[in-house]
C-alpha cells in the first residue's frame, strides 16, 4: 500500500511481520502486539527499528512501558465507523508523549485525514482508490478542529489533564 507522510508519497522501509516470521537478520519491523514481548527480548537494547501493530481492541496502556524502545506504532481502522484508532493515536501522542511515528492503517477515507492528523497520526497506509492530490486537499479542507483542544495555539500541553475525565469515567445515558 502507498504511504503518505508530510503530505507526500514515500517508500515504506517497514516490514510487517506475522505471528511466525523470524526477527533474525531483519531491521525496520512491525510486529503484532502478541509478539511484542518476544521481539523486545530478541531485539538488541539501543537498536532502533522496532514497531508494533496495535489492534483497535487493545489498550494503549498495554504498550506504554515499551514506548521508549518503539519507533512506530500502527493503529488500525477496520471499518469506517470504528474510531478507536483516533483515541489510541491521541493517547499515544498527547497523553504519553510518544515521539515516534504513529501510522494509520485500514479503512479510512480522505475526509478523515485531517482528524487523524489532529489526533497525532503522521503516517498513513492509504488505498489506491484515491490520489495523493485528494488526500492532500483534505488535509486543510476542514477549517474547524474536531475538538477545541486541538485548535492552533491551544495545544494539549495547556489543557488541565488533572481535571479531565477519561471516557470511562464520564456518565453515559441510554
Segments the model singles out, each with a brief description of its role:
Residues 83, 97, 105, 111, ...:
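Residues lining hydrophobic/aromatic ligand-binding pockets adjacent to catalytic sites
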Residues 9, 13-54:
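A positional/architectural concept
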Residues 40-47, 61-70:
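Acidic (Asp/Glu)-rich catalytic clusters
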Residues 28, 49-51, 72-74, 101-103, ...:
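Structural preference for beta-strand elements that scaffold enzyme active sites
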Residues 52-54, 60-65, 109-123:
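Catalytic cores of alpha/beta
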Residues 45-52, 91-104:
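Short beta-strand/loop segments at the ligand-binding rim of alpha/beta enzyme cores
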Residues 34-42, 80-93, 132-142:
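Active-site-adjacent beta->alpha loops and helix N-cap segments on the catalytic face
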Residues 4, 99-101, 110-112, 124, ...:
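Alpha/beta catalytic cores of nucleotide-metabolism and tRNA/nucleoside-modifying enzymes
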Amino acid at each position: 500500500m502507498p504511504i503518505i507522510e508530510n503530505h507526500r508519497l514515500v517508500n515504506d522501509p517497514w516490514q510487517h511481520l506475522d505471528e511466525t516470521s523470524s526477527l533474525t537478520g531483519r531491521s525496520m519491523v512491525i510486529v503484532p502486539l502478541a509478539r511484542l514481548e518476544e521481539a523486545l527480548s530478541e531485539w538488541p537494547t539501543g537498536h532502533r527499528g522496532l514497531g508494533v501493530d496495535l489492534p483497535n481492541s487493545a489498550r494503549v496502556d498495554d504498550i506504554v512501558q515499551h514506548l521508549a524502545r518503539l519507533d512506530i506504532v500502527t493503529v488500525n481502522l477496520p471499518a469506517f465507523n470504528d474510531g478507536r484508532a483516533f483515541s489510541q493515536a491521541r493517547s499515544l501522542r498527547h497523553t504519553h508523549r510518544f515521539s515516534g511515528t504513529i501510522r494509520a492503517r485500514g479503512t479510512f477515507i480522505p475526509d478523515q485525514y485531517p482528524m487523524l492528523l489532529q489526533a497525532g497520526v503522521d503516517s498513513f497506509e492509504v488505498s489506491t482508490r484515491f490520489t495523493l492530490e485528494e488526500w492532500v486537499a483534505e488535509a486543510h479542507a476542514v477549517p474547524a478542529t474536531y475538538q477545541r483542544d486541538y485548535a492552533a495555539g491551544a495545544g494539549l500541553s495547556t489543557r488541565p489533564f488533572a481535571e479531565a475525565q477519561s471516557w470511562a469515567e464520564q456518565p453515559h445515558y441510554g
